[in-house]
């Protein structure tokens, strides 16, 4: 690879063409100035200002990409684990020595001052930058598979977070320094222990570059690579698909970084530009990959452990169309970027995955019945992929909704902190957020935060679309259109309240085992558990508005949990997903639950073979800081009922998935294509889908009732509450009246007839509840519309204003109107401010030429806007019109001439 310092101006221009879309307006300026590679690596804020890149955010985007080039050019042959640990140790020693020497000074004011000196803050930033450089290595293979390195990484992350929190506290500097010294001493101990106790040669090995040729790519086959891009433009391969061109090369492994594609450096590029470059030559691709050392503890990187799927066939189906996420805030270019990448992540899994077995080699009760004959082989490892059985029992399996980008990989054990990945930044450290934990499993959207908005904000790890089976096993996804036959809508199953579930097949208080119980706290928590059909919900109490967890029982197994020390415990497990442990108060209750759950599993297997397999939980939500103690057993009324499951599925009251927890919707591999085809719907689409389901004879439990004129407005609010912004409901009501006029003009009651007898009882109860709560609905509608009970407009709170910019409508046309209104309001405020400044100048009785010249220098942009408006406006026909122009527009340039 040619060094970046040897780049010609043409190579620099070619590299800038792949950067963020908002930077393309400056490409011609780089071309005009003929900047070479050496000048590019030394570019600064001042240089960018002279080039015409005036916006700070745009400058930061360019400098972030240049930082990656500097790391590639200067640190490739020198950086290794040992050097990075030594750099972290040196930074911590420097900070410790600075604090000690400062305290010895006679002018020390740490006990009286609350403002830390700049040198102190700079040393802290340098320490965190050195820690990030080390964590970027620990976050990838081969270090993610080694327990010692994983523990070290988690400790460093926690210490850096403590360090960041400490320097931001409002306290005396001496107290701040004491806490920083405590953190620094622990960091020094970790660094010393890592250097002394680790003798693995991988500590001294540097990364290397390797060129990979992928020839003879068949049309429609794709490359079979899984690529994850960081926010600043680093592209990491997270795995390959079996029997794909990338897999057949035997040179592409998880953790490799894509440096060049067809001799073009793509470091710092947008992912969609990388995909375009990969598709540039349909016959073959030449990749230059940066590989980490691979010699730790006999560790050799494998393409992935997703070999459970059969060799894929060449795809002939067209790429699916993605739908717009209702809560997404990304711009149009980023949405197009999703659909442009879908062809890279192929092929889809087969319809029938392997079936795991228990220790005796037999199929477990309640498991999948698609494979009946056991395979020959030794006991406990009868399938060629039996090693996955043990791994998957302690792993979680997540899958994103249909509008998320499929085919990304993640790992397990997420830390409940807001972090994101960052590559080692050489040169001046930048105050970025912490890199993500390497052994975690979550849902994070790499496109959820547009890069044009800067890089200082934290990005939640709950917003990336990933899918994995274990630490490195990936399953490619492909959306397939499928007609909806279920009688319920696609949304988070946990959004249904305990009261709305109606009659249940079995319900009562059960203990549920926490996934991560601390050493001293109780490992079991009491929940109100409801079994309805094939769905199992658990709530914190009987009046909860949202379930803490949800499991769709098909393909799960129900059996006694003999491995638990808790009495009367049983488990609901799936070898490819996870295991839930529950415990009853006595043997009778446990037997009732086992019978009911087993019947639900068997009944659903025989009736709905293509049913999706879900698991949602809020057990690990970061918002739940403290657990509420369960009510005393004496006050808990045990209401275990034994009723047959109705043929209808649980009624859901929304149309969009909720990804508010770290554990989200999960599905069995056999239902991936069908489950991903569910798209978000507007209200007309929802009514159409319900009508279609009604024609097919499917039970439907979703109804919208319209009563008197005032309650009808509340009903419309209730039906469309997920589609509109709360603080702007007054404006949205006028918009929604047009959208729903065709429905309301033809139907006074939006109901679904011909319901089965099993759901009539539930409907009667729901109708009774709706009649009883009519005033409550009306009050909530007034509250959502920011109106008082008397109809007066009440000011919006800060929380509502914040929500108005977070929530998004599902209707794109209304979204555009809302955005236009916000834009016009902002423009109006800006113009009013400019007008006030001009009026202040004109109303000054002591205005002189000197004051005006000073004002003109301070308001150069305003003067330029006035000149531009004057050029755009038609010239007056007569000189007599000048006084009228002055009266009409005091901001006209004629004011300047008169002065």
From Swiss-Prot:
CDD domains: PDZ_CNK1_2_3-like, PH_CNK_mammalian-like, SAM_CNK1_2_3-suppressor. SMART domains: PDZ, PH, SAM. Residues 7-72 form the SAM domain. Keywords: Phosphoprotein. InterPro entries: CNK1-3_SAM, CNK2/3_dom, CNKSR, CRIC_domain, PDZ, PDZ_sf, PH-like_dom_sf, PH_domain. Residues 309-334, 347-390, 605-687, 735-770, 868-899 are annotated as: Disordered. GO terms for biological process: positive regulation of cellular response to hepatocyte growth factor stimulus; regulation of signal transduction. Pfam families: CNK2_3_dom (PF06663), CRIC_ras_sig (PF10534), PDZ (PF00595), PH (PF00169), SAM_1 (PF00536). It comes from the Eukaryota. Residues 851-899 are annotated as: Required for interaction with CYTH2. The modification Phosphoserine is found at residues 383, 873. Residues 332-457 form the DUF1170 domain. Residues 613-624 have a biased composition (Acidic residues). Residues 761-770 have a biased composition (Basic and acidic residues). PANTHER family: CNK3_IPCEF1 FUSION PROTEIN-RELATED (PTHR12844:SF45), CONNECTOR ENCHANCER OF KINASE SUPPRESSOR OF RAS (PTHR12844). This is CNK3/IPCEF1 fusion protein. The lineage of its organism: Eukaryota, Metazoa, Chordata, Craniata, Vertebrata.
């Amino acid at each position: 690879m040619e060094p970046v310092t040897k780049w010609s101006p043409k190579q620099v221009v070619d590299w800038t063409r792949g950067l963020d879309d908002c930077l393309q307006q400056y490409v011609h300026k780089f071309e005009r100035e003929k900047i070479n590679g050496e000048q590019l690596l030394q570019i600064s804020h001042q240089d960018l200002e002279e080039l015409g890149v005036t916006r700070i955010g745009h400058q930061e985007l360019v400098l972030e990409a240049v930082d990656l080039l500097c790391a590639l050019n200067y640190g490739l042959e020198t950086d290794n684990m040992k050097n990075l640990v030594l750099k972290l140790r040196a930074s911590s020693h420097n900070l410790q020595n600075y604090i000690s020497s400062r305290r010895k000074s006679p002018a020390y004011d740490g006990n009286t001052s609350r403002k830390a000196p700049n040198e102190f803050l700079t040393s802290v930033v340098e320490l965190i930058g050195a820690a990030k450089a080390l964590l970027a290595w620990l976050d990838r293979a081969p270090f993610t598979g080694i327990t010692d390195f994983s523990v070290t990484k988690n400790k460093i992350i926690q210490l850096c977070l403590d360090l960041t929190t400490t320097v931001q506290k409002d306290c005396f500097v001496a107290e701040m320094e004491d806490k920083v010294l405590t953190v620094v001493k622990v960091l020094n101990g970790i660094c010393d222990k890592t250097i002394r106790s680790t003798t693995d040669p991988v500590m001294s090995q540097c990364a290397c570059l390797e060129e990979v040729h992928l020839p003879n790519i068949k049309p429609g086959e794709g490359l079979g690579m899984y690529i994850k891009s960081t926010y600043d433009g680093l592209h990491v391969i997270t795995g390959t698909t079996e029997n794909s061109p990338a897999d057949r090369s035997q040179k592409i492994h998880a953790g490799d970084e894509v440096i060049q594609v067809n001799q073009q450096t793509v470091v710092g590029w947008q992912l969609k530009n990388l995909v375009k470059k990969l598709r540039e030559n349909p016959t073959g691709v030449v990749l230059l990959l940066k590989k980490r050392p691979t010699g730790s503890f006999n560790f050799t990187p494998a393409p992935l452990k997703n070999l459970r799927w059969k060799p894929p066939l060449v795809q002939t189906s067209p790429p699916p169309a993605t739908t717009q996420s209702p809560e997404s805030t990304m711009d149009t270019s980023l949405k197009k970027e999703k659909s442009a990448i879908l062809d890279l992540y192929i092929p889809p899994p087969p319809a029938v995955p392997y079936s795991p077995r228990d220790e005796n080699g037999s199929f477990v009760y309640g498991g999948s019945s698609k494979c009946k004959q056991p395979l020959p082989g030794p006991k406990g490892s009868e399938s060629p992929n039996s090693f996955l059985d043990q791994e998957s029992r302690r792993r979680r399996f997540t899958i994103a909704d249909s509008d998320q980008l499929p085919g990304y990989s993640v790992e397990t054990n997420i830390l409940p902190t807001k972090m994101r990945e960052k590559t080692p930044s050489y040169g001046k450290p930048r105050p970025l957020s912490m890199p993500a934990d390497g052994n975690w499993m979550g849902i994070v959207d790499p496109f959820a935060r547009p890069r044009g908005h800067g890089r200082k904000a934290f990005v939640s790890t709950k917003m990336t679309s990933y899918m994995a089976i274990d630490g490195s096993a990936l399953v490619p996804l492909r959306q397939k259109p499928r007609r909806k036959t279920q009688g319920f809508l696609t949304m988070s199953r946990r959004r249904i309240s305990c009261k709305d579930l109606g009659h249940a097949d079995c319900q009562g208080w059960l203990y549920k085992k926490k996934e991560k119980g601390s050493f001293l706290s109780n490992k079991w928590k009491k929940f109100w558990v409801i079994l309805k059909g094939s769905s199992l919900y658990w709530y914190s109490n009987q009046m909860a508005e949202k379930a803490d967890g949800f499991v769709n029982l098909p393909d799960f197994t129900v059996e006694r949990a003999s491995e638990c020390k808790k009495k009367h415990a049983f488990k609901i497990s799936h070898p490819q997903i996870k295991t839930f442990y529950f415990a009853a108060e006595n043997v009778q209750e446990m037997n009732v639950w086992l019978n009911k759950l087993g019947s639900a599993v068997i009944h659903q297997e025989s009736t709905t073979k293509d049913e999706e397999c879900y698991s949602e939980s809020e057990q690990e939500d970061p918002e739940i800081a403290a657990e509420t103690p369960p009510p005393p057993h004496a006050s808990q009324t045990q209401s275990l009922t034994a009723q047959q499951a109705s043929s209808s599925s649980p009624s859901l009251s929304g149309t969009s998935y909720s990804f508010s927890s770290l554990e989200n919707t999960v599905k069995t591999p056999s239902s991936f294509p069908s489950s991903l085809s569910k798209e978000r719907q507007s209200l007309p689409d929802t009514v159409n889908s319900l009508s279609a389901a009604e024609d097919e004879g499917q039970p439907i439990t979703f109804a919208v009732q319209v009563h008197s004129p005032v309650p009808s407005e509340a009903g419309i609010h209730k039906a469309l509450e997920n589609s509109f912004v709360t603080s702007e409901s007054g404006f949205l009501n006028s918009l929604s009246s047009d959208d729903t006029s065709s429905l309301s003009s033809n139907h006074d009651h939006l109901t679904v007839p011909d319901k089965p007898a099993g759901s009539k009882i539930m409907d009667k109860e729901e109708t009774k509840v709706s009649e009883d709560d009519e005033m409550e609905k009306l009050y909530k509608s007034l509250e959502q519309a920011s109106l008082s009970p008397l109809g007066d407009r009440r000011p919006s709170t800060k929380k509502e204003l914040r929500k108005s910019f977070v929530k998004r409508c599902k209707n794109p046309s209304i979204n555009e109107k809302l955005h236009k209104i916000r834009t016009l309001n902002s423009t109006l405020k800006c113009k009013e401010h400019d007008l006030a400044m001009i009026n202040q100048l004109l109303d000054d009785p002591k205005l002189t030429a000197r004051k005006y010249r000073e004002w003109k220098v301070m308001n150069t942009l305003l003067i330029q806007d006035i000149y531009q408006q004057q050029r755009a406006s038609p010239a007056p026909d007569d000189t007599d019109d000048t006084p009228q122009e002055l009266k009409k527009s005091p901001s006209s340039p004629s004011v300047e001439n008169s002065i």
